[in-house]
Amino acid sequence: MNNIRKTHPLMKIVNSSFIDLPAPSNISSWWNFGSLLGICLVAQILTGLFLAMHYTSDTMTAFSSVTHICRDVNYGWLIRYLHANGASMFFICLFLHVGRGLYYGSYMYLETWNIGVLLLFAVMATAFMGYVLPWGQMSFWGATVITNLLSAIPYIGTNLVEWIWGGFSVDKATLTRFFAFHFILPFIVAALAGVHLLFLHETGSNNPSGLNSDTDKIPFHPYYTIKDILGALIMITALSSLVLFSPDLLGDPDNYIPANPLNTPPHIKPEWYFLFAYAILRSIPNKLGGVLALVLSIAILAIIPLLHTAKQRSMMFRPLSQCLFWILVADLFTLTWIGGQPVEHPFVVIGQLASVIYFMLILLIMPTTSMIENQLLKW
């Protein structure tokens, strides 16, 4: 009798993706983040669904409905904080996943990489719109400031902003449409993640050495299923600790003040996972220039494969590139810190320096260093 796992039309797709999938024998824990992101996405969709059952997307009642969820709904506080901190966990996993791709040269799988960049943009858009929904001070002013950036687009800018707002300011129409988009986007993200996996399975996984691993493959199950479960348990433990011990650690206290268009908060800033891009935006005095730098800070990932000048795929055997990679990581931490600081001396100068270093490293220094390493191989 044939194994149903290998013959059933649906089961054989699952089988070839998660059970009998040939995987390199040497992939490290840095390869766990794909599955962790999948878990995050499912958790966000489920908690979001339950929140949407009690939330009202009206400027008069949005803030109250979130309060109602936390106070009156059974385990509403838990669902709300799992959703809010789940987003932080999602971005931690995303950044580590992208960092892994950069370090080990996974960007050489062009289709997989480009869909990944698209996914990053989609998740960032989803998170931004989700942050607006509780309708606190930071929700309102964050939405106002970020959507206003589009007015820097020549000729159509002002019309575009008013079209997105659905009026002449961020108001009821804006909140309602942001709720609609925030609800639908995660399902688009899930579909894109499916395509991301589809392209990955066309080529198979990369591995730490960056070498072809066709000669040494092992089945995904049980080896990597058990490894992924361990990673998931660690992540769930971290998320649970955050939610149950300090749920507001990563949030902004200003968001516990209902939105007031007549009162601007002293420091308008987005959630921590956008601070690096926000710092790059603020480091350029020109509005349009800042917006372009903001978009390019993420979009630059799409041209990383074109900047690969090394003869080796992975950085595993390239110590100079490794040093530069960790300088880039330190630079991103610096930008994140600066993004949360007020616009005053010395933070402005530090932000400008960190922004220049960020683009210089990616566009010039790292490709040049790779070429130097190619020459060193001959010695």
Curated annotation (Swiss-Prot):
Heme b b566 binds at residues 97, 196. GO terms for molecular function: metal ion binding; ubiquinol-cytochrome-c reductase activity. Binds 2 heme b groups non-covalently. Pfam families: Cytochrom_B_C, Cytochrome_B. It is found in: Mitochondrion inner membrane. The keyword Iron applies. Gene3D superfamilies: Cytochrome Bc1 Complex, Chain C. Keywords: Electron transport, Heme, Iron, Membrane, Metal-binding, Mitochondrion, Mitochondrion inner membrane, Respiratory chain, Transmembrane, Transmembrane helix, Transport, Ubiquinone. Heme 1 (or BL or b562) is low-potential and absorbs at about 562 nm, and heme 2 (or BH or b566) is high-potential and absorbs at about 566 nm. The cytochrome bc1 complex contains 11 subunits: 3 respiratory subunits (MT-CYB, CYC1 and UQCRFS1), 2 core proteins (UQCRC1 and UQCRC2) and 6 low-molecular weight proteins (UQCRH/QCR6, UQCRB/QCR7, UQCRQ/QCR8, UQCR10/QCR9, UQCR11/QCR10 and a cleavage product of UQCRFS1). This cytochrome bc1 complex then forms a dimer. This is Cytochrome b. It comes from Crocidura rapax kurodai (Kuroda's shrew).
